[in-house]
Amino acid sequence: MAEKTQEFELKLLFPQEKFKGIEQFLISKGGLRRQRLQAAYIDTDDFLLARSGIAFRVRKEGRFWVQTLKVATGHSLERLEHNVPLIHSGANLPQWSLESHRDHEAGKALYRLLPKLKTTDLRVRYKTDIYRRAAQVKARGAVLEYALDSGVIKALHNDGSELTVDVSELEIELLSGDKSVVLAHAKNMIKKYKAYIDTRSKAQRGFNLATGIQVSPPLKTKALKLSTFDDVTIISTVLHSCINQALINASEINANLANFDEHLHQLRVGLRRLKTAMKFMALRHIFFAEVDLNTLDNFFAKLGAYRDLNFLDEKLLPALLAAKAPPMKLASVADLPHPDALIKSQDVQLFFISVLGIIIEAEKNNVNLKYFKPLILKELDKIHKDTKKTANTFMMVSDDERHRLRKKLKRLRYALEFFKDLCHAGRYKEFLKKLEGVSDALGQYNDICVALEKIQSLVEQDRNVFFAQGWLKAEQARVLVLSNKELKTFYADKKAW
């Protein structure tokens, strides 16, 4: 059988007390022996490969050595992969060569990204020492490999000291067949062993360890590039962008992240983008199941509590302090539990799996179709027309109407990031800039409204809160006028599509 070009794999973490149960499961499936895997990850002095989403390693697998190149794709669960057996004996590290991968898709991607890179530019940057228990599972429609890994990642610090981090994880890899079978098996592990998705590779964790980075930066949104305008490309690119942002930021929060504010914000952005994307997907008859929609709404609402209190901590209290407000006690994010328990919950993890399943099914069912583009443009027109109507009476409508307008314009903003390639290049940048100005002003207004609602109950307990209430009401009036001005500027411009 020819080697796969692309790896599809789902990694799961779990409470440590579940390790034995998972190990017994693999033993029952034929994973009777553990294999020691000792790998050296190779990179430039400034980690050019890692920063480009590329992992290059040489690994001792029992008595044999294998050289592997992995290149990230736009999908967090899929990577281009090429394995080359090395003729070498002994424990010493064999000679490696990038040239061995040049004719493979992974090698071609590497040289597109880094055309001047040479093997002589590389050296060992970090290592892994892993014991793996693996079992091959034949399921209806696919052959999978379960791999339970335990061990350590090692890196040398600049002062010569060795740093280590423990590894304990389960990988479910598709060897052949239907990707959705991987998701079905992952669901079982989530339900039975309280497992949860983790997108961080050993290479990424090794890079962080070697460079002294405590946590990878939050993944932020950016305008997408559509290679073609067929339905599969649009659906896959947009939905993968949303779920990647959610999963990657969630994985960092789950890694005992103390200062999680920005990662949590970007997780919420990913979920909002997903909501917007699914409204467009409905045009192609792609929908959430009711249970998933309920889970998303509930999850988003609970995460919203952190966002609301962040406004009090980071914006309101500093502003009150600058205005020489008397001391007062307001609710704080510090009063809330760490959000990892919420993210790791079974309902949320099954929701993530369902989204991945929606993408896989949509990719199967929309091959060679090109119905989506005109539907998208028509929907953009509708959103623009509806919001303009409300904007024309902005100073007279209720706060609820203003809130709905804000959400619709946020949807338009995310849609333009999805569908930049459907817009006029000359008008896009200025249009988006003005839309961001409107969104920021309306966002400020909404934050103030939420803050006023939250402190209302505190007024009788702490008379100093009257100061905060008065300051907020004055600020609310100012931002209302600002929002109206931004709206007029925005709608005076031509559409970008």
Give names to the regions the model predicted:
Residues 1-497:
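Function-determining surface determinants
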